[in-house]
A protein has these predicted regions:
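C-terminal engagement/docking regions of AAA+ P-loop ATPases
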Residues: 41-46, 250-261, 272-349
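Basic, amphipathic alpha-helical bundle interface domains used for macromolecular binding and assembly
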Residues: 133, 191-301
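Residue-level signal for alpha-helical context at structural boundaries
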Residues: 40, 65-69, 108-109, 154, ...
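Noncatalytic linker/hinge segments flanking ATPase motor cores
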Residues: 118-125, 161-168, 202-210, 224-231, ...
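Short leucine-rich amphipathic alpha-helices used at interfaces
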Residues: 104, 110, 154, 215, ...
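Conserved ASCE/P-loop NTPase catalytic core
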Residues: 1-196
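Short amphipathic alpha-helical patches
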Residues: 32, 36, 45-50, 113-114, ...
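Short, structured secondary-structure boundary patches
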Residues: 56-58, 75, 169-170, 209-210, ...
């Protein structure tokens, strides 16, 4: 099998939620990325790599042979982060060879610079160094990366669609990292025997003749690529109805979700869905469809308990003050201290 040829995205069996989330992330990077959660062997990495066939063309700044910046248009690329990546590999660092041979400091671009206007994929993100994860998520939120190494500094754009995947059997993510991902997908093993058999049949056909297998889906993939590009163009025109806004915020409050990233993810994903459907307004139905993807795993039982404890403690403090007869506790305004007379006024004695 030619490792350079990705498995066709439309040949994936089942997993409609995963496929929907990945396409929405291509349409609207402001969603905040997608986290795929599931055991080994269920197609997480295969699905992400399959996106290369439907990625739209984008403009990005590159360097010509003389080192001058030029704008070039081409398809988005998938930039994969190695599991053993160091912080310097990600944000950029000093070129050690140049430093040793030429006795000068040269800052090299990191993975985040290469990911600009592309898709950054992090497999097994729960096993990655925490500092590396923080740097990536900060760049994704701010759209730029600042590097300082000794006297050298550099600020470069790093706007990208972010996809992460993990196996929860190997450990979890910190809540503050989990919160940064806009959509969360549980990629469960296929339950239907016929579906599992179809996975085998398609995998075998792809292994035996990848080019012939891909040809079966070529026309549909091309149409999907055009639809993704059209949705990205339409997205700025998509508005949100007042009823949809009200339902989104009411749902988040009813679930007692503390993070304001919840409404960003929910509403931006709903806008992406509408653009993909070639519509111009988010409705209540869009919110209902997207809510599980955007709101799951956002509730914090710890914070709910903490807030309840604070409320009880505040009531206890107020009760203690009331028993002591304090003016504030009894509803009386505190007496003002007599001040000096203002200029031009006579103090009353």
């Amino acid at each position: 099998m030619d490792e350079l040829l990705p498995y066709p995205f439309l040949a994936l069996v089942g997993q409609p939620e995963m496929k929907t989330a990945l396409v929405l992330a291509l349409v609207n990077p402001r969603i905040g990325g997608v986290l795929l959660i599931g055991p080994y062997g269920v197609g997480k990495t295969t699905a992400v790599r399959a996106l290369s066939d439907i990625m739209p063309n984008v403009e990005r700044e590159e360097r010509d042979d003389e080192g001058k910046p030029v704008l070039r248009r081409g398809p988005m690329r998938i930039v994969e982060l190695p599991l053993n990546a160091r912080l310097e590999d990600v944000v950029g660092g000093i070129n050690e060879r140049v430093a040793l041979e030429q006795q000068r400091i040269l800052l090299e671009d990191g993975v985040l610079a290469k990911a600009h206007r592309n898709l950054l994929y992090i497999d097994e993100i729960n096993l990655l160094d925490a500092r590396v994860v923080d740097a990536i998520l900060d760049a994704a939120a701010q759209g730029r990366t600042f590097v300082r190494r000794g006297p050298m500094t550099r600020l470069y754009p790093s706007q990208f669609a972010l996809i992460g995947s993990m196996n929860p059997e190997e450990g979890t993510l910190r809540p503050q990292i989990l919160d940064r991902f806009g959509l969360r997908v549980w990629v469960a093993p296929l339950a239907e025997p016929q579906q599992r058999l179809e996975v085998y049949r398609r995998a075998r056909a792809f292994h035996e003749d990848p080019e012939a297998f891909r040809e079966r889906y070529a026309d549909e993939l091309y149409r999907l690529k055009l639809e993704v590009a059209a949705a990205r163009e339409l997205l700025p025109q998509v508005a949100i109805s007042a009823a949809a806004e009200e339902l989104a915020i009411s749902s988040i409050q009813a679930l007692k979700i503390p993070s304001h990233r919840a409404e960003i993810a929910l509403l931006e994903a709903a806008r992406a869905r509408v653009a993909a459907d070639n519509r111009l307004e988010v409705t209540i139905e869009d919110i209902v469809k997207i809510a599980p993807l955007a709101l799951r795993q956002r509730r914090s039982l710890h914070l709910e308990g903490y807030a309840a404890t604070i409320a009880i403690e505040d009531a206890t403090i107020a009760e203690a003050l009331a028993q002591l007869g304090t003016p504030a506790a009894n509803g009386r305004a505190p007496r003002k201290r007599a001040g000096r007379a203002k200029a031009g006024e006579t103090a009353k004695g």
